[in-house]
Protein backbone atom coordinates (compact mmCIF):
# COMPACT_ATOMS: atom_id res chain seq x y z
CA UNK A 1 0.00 0.00 0.00
CA UNK A 2 1.22 3.49 -0.80
CA UNK A 3 0.43 6.40 1.47
CA UNK A 4 0.16 9.90 0.01
CA UNK A 5 0.05 13.09 2.03
CA UNK A 6 -1.59 16.22 0.66
CA UNK A 7 -1.33 19.76 2.00
CA UNK A 8 -5.03 20.54 1.66
CA UNK A 9 -8.37 19.36 0.28
CA UNK A 10 -7.71 20.70 -3.22
CA UNK A 11 -4.40 18.89 -3.48
CA UNK A 12 -5.93 15.69 -2.07
CA UNK A 13 -8.82 15.87 -4.56
CA UNK A 14 -6.43 16.33 -7.48
CA UNK A 15 -4.22 13.49 -6.30
CA UNK A 16 -7.20 11.15 -5.87
CA UNK A 17 -8.56 12.01 -9.33
CA UNK A 18 -5.12 11.53 -10.89
CA UNK A 19 -4.74 8.10 -9.25
CA UNK A 20 -8.21 7.02 -10.41
CA UNK A 21 -7.56 8.31 -13.94
CA UNK A 22 -4.22 6.48 -14.06
CA UNK A 23 -5.96 3.25 -13.05
CA UNK A 24 -8.56 3.69 -15.80
CA UNK A 25 -5.88 4.43 -18.40
CA UNK A 26 -3.92 1.36 -17.28
CA UNK A 27 -7.00 -0.88 -17.30
CA UNK A 28 -10.02 0.62 -19.14
CA UNK A 29 -12.38 -1.99 -17.67
CA UNK A 30 -11.29 -1.31 -14.09
CA UNK A 31 -13.61 -1.99 -11.19
CA UNK A 32 -13.56 1.09 -8.98
CA UNK A 33 -14.71 1.07 -5.39
CA UNK A 34 -16.29 4.45 -4.74
CA UNK A 35 -17.35 6.38 -1.68
CA UNK A 36 -19.89 9.10 -0.93
CA UNK A 37 -19.97 12.04 1.44
CA UNK A 38 -18.35 15.42 1.10
CA UNK A 39 -14.75 14.17 0.91
CA UNK A 40 -14.75 12.62 -2.60
CA UNK A 41 -16.75 15.38 -4.33
CA UNK A 42 -13.61 17.30 -5.32
CA UNK A 43 -12.10 14.17 -6.86
CA UNK A 44 -15.33 13.50 -8.76
CA UNK A 45 -15.36 17.07 -10.08
CA UNK A 46 -11.81 16.62 -11.37
CA UNK A 47 -12.71 13.30 -13.02
CA UNK A 48 -15.62 15.01 -14.77
CA UNK A 49 -13.24 17.74 -15.98
CA UNK A 50 -10.83 15.11 -17.33
CA UNK A 51 -13.71 13.40 -19.14
CA UNK A 52 -14.97 16.70 -20.59
CA UNK A 53 -11.43 17.52 -21.78
CA UNK A 54 -11.31 14.19 -23.64
CA UNK A 55 -8.63 12.80 -21.33
CA UNK A 56 -10.70 10.02 -19.80
CA UNK A 57 -13.08 7.34 -21.09
CA UNK A 58 -15.24 5.59 -18.50
CA UNK A 59 -17.32 3.56 -20.96
CA UNK A 60 -15.85 0.23 -19.78
CA UNK A 61 -15.47 1.08 -16.09
CA UNK A 62 -17.53 -0.73 -13.46
CA UNK A 63 -18.13 0.67 -10.00
CA UNK A 64 -18.99 -0.80 -6.62
CA UNK A 65 -20.09 1.75 -4.06
CA UNK A 66 -19.14 1.23 -0.47
CA UNK A 67 -22.52 1.59 1.21
CA UNK A 68 -26.17 2.65 1.25
CA UNK A 69 -28.71 3.53 3.92
CA UNK A 70 -31.17 0.75 4.69
CA UNK A 71 -34.65 1.80 3.61
CA UNK A 72 -33.68 4.37 0.96
CA UNK A 73 -34.02 3.77 -2.76
CA UNK A 74 -32.07 5.23 -5.66
CA UNK A 75 -34.53 8.06 -6.17
CA UNK A 76 -34.25 9.38 -2.62
CA UNK A 77 -32.11 12.56 -2.60
CA UNK A 78 -30.44 11.34 0.62
CA UNK A 79 -29.56 7.96 -0.86
CA UNK A 80 -26.14 7.16 -2.21
CA UNK A 81 -27.30 6.00 -5.66
CA UNK A 82 -28.85 9.45 -6.08
CA UNK A 83 -25.66 11.07 -4.77
CA UNK A 84 -23.44 9.17 -7.20
CA UNK A 85 -25.71 9.89 -10.16
CA UNK A 86 -25.65 13.61 -9.43
CA UNK A 87 -22.00 13.91 -8.38
CA UNK A 88 -20.41 11.72 -11.07
CA UNK A 89 -22.33 9.17 -13.14
CA UNK A 90 -24.69 11.62 -14.91
CA UNK A 91 -21.70 13.69 -16.07
CA UNK A 92 -19.49 11.04 -17.69
CA UNK A 93 -19.88 8.24 -20.22
CA UNK A 94 -20.13 5.40 -17.71
CA UNK A 95 -22.86 2.86 -18.43
CA UNK A 96 -25.46 2.99 -15.65
CA UNK A 97 -25.74 -0.81 -15.69
CA UNK A 98 -22.05 -0.91 -14.71
CA UNK A 99 -22.61 1.23 -11.61
CA UNK A 100 -23.49 -0.64 -8.44
CA UNK A 101 -24.80 0.59 -5.10
CA UNK A 102 -26.33 -1.71 -2.46
CA UNK A 103 -30.13 -1.80 -2.74
CA UNK A 104 -31.35 -0.05 0.39
CA UNK A 105 -34.95 -1.16 -0.14
CA UNK A 106 -34.23 -4.88 0.04
CA UNK A 107 -34.05 -6.87 3.26
CA UNK A 108 -30.52 -7.20 4.68
CA UNK A 109 -29.80 -10.81 3.72
CA UNK A 110 -30.98 -10.31 0.15
CA UNK A 111 -29.36 -6.90 -0.39
CA UNK A 112 -26.00 -7.91 1.08
CA UNK A 113 -25.92 -11.34 -0.56
CA UNK A 114 -26.75 -9.93 -3.99
CA UNK A 115 -24.13 -7.21 -3.60
CA UNK A 116 -21.42 -9.68 -2.64
CA UNK A 117 -22.35 -11.82 -5.65
CA UNK A 118 -22.01 -8.76 -7.94
CA UNK A 119 -18.64 -7.99 -6.42
CA UNK A 120 -17.47 -11.55 -6.96
CA UNK A 121 -18.71 -11.57 -10.58
CA UNK A 122 -16.85 -8.30 -11.19
CA UNK A 123 -13.55 -9.97 -10.33
CA UNK A 124 -12.89 -7.71 -7.35
CA UNK A 125 -12.05 -4.06 -6.90
CA UNK A 126 -8.97 -2.70 -8.67
CA UNK A 127 -8.87 0.62 -6.80
CA UNK A 128 -10.88 1.72 -3.75
CA UNK A 129 -11.57 5.35 -2.87
CA UNK A 130 -12.32 5.80 0.83
CA UNK A 131 -13.08 8.63 3.15
CA UNK A 132 -12.91 8.62 6.92
CA UNK A 133 -15.98 9.70 8.85
CA UNK A 134 -15.78 12.24 11.64
CA UNK A 135 -15.41 9.44 14.20
CA UNK A 136 -13.06 7.38 12.04
CA UNK A 137 -15.65 5.16 10.40
CA UNK A 138 -14.84 3.69 6.99
CA UNK A 139 -17.97 3.14 4.96
CA UNK A 140 -20.42 2.60 7.77
CA UNK A 141 -18.00 0.36 9.66
CA UNK A 142 -17.81 2.08 13.02
CA UNK A 143 -14.45 2.19 14.86
CA UNK A 144 -15.49 -0.32 17.53
CA UNK A 145 -16.63 -2.94 15.00
CA UNK A 146 -14.58 -5.79 13.64
CA UNK A 147 -14.19 -5.69 9.87
CA UNK A 148 -16.30 -8.13 7.90
CA UNK A 149 -15.24 -9.79 4.66
CA UNK A 150 -18.76 -9.44 3.30
CA UNK A 151 -21.32 -6.72 2.77
CA UNK A 152 -23.40 -6.50 5.91
CA UNK A 153 -26.07 -4.50 7.72
CA UNK A 154 -24.87 -2.26 10.53
CA UNK A 155 -26.51 -0.14 13.19
CA UNK A 156 -25.33 3.44 12.85
CA UNK A 157 -23.74 5.06 15.89
CA UNK A 158 -25.40 8.07 17.44
CA UNK A 159 -22.43 10.23 16.43
CA UNK A 160 -22.79 9.13 12.78
CA UNK A 161 -26.55 9.79 12.86
CA UNK A 162 -25.94 13.24 14.34
CA UNK A 163 -23.23 14.05 11.78
CA UNK A 164 -25.37 12.91 8.84
CA UNK A 165 -28.48 14.75 10.04
CA UNK A 166 -27.28 17.82 8.12
CA UNK A 167 -28.24 16.02 4.89
CA UNK A 168 -31.82 15.35 6.09
CA UNK A 169 -34.68 17.60 7.18
CA UNK A 170 -34.26 16.36 10.74
CA UNK A 171 -32.24 13.87 12.74
CA UNK A 172 -35.36 11.71 13.04
CA UNK A 173 -35.25 11.11 9.28
CA UNK A 174 -31.72 9.68 9.29
CA UNK A 175 -31.91 5.90 8.83
CA UNK A 176 -30.63 3.92 11.80
CA UNK A 177 -29.07 1.18 9.70
CA UNK A 178 -27.02 0.87 6.53
CA UNK A 179 -25.51 -1.76 4.25
CA UNK A 180 -21.75 -1.52 3.95
CA UNK A 181 -18.81 -3.45 2.55
Regions found by a protein language model. Give the residues of each.
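N-terminal glycine-/serine-/threonine-rich phosphate-binding loop
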Residues: 1-32
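Generic structural signal for well-ordered alpha-helical scaffold segments
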Residues: 17-25, 48, 52, 85-89, ...
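Glycine-rich N-terminal segment of FAD-binding domains in flavoprotein oxidoreductases
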Residues: 26-52
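A glycine- and small-aliphatic-rich helix-loop capping segment at beta-alpha/alpha-beta transitions
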Residues: 46-57, 80, 143-153
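Ligand-binding beta-strand-loop-alpha-helix segment within the catalytic cores
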Residues: 56-128
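Glycine-rich phosphate-binding loop
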Residues: 123-148
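Class I SAM-dependent methyltransferase SAM-binding "motif I" and its flanking Rossmann-like core
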Residues: 139-181
Amino acid sequence: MRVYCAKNYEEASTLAADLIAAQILLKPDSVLGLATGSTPIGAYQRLIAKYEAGELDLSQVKTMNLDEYRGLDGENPNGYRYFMNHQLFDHVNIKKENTNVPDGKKDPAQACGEYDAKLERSGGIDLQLLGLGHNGHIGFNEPAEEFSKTTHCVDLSESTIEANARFFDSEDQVPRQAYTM
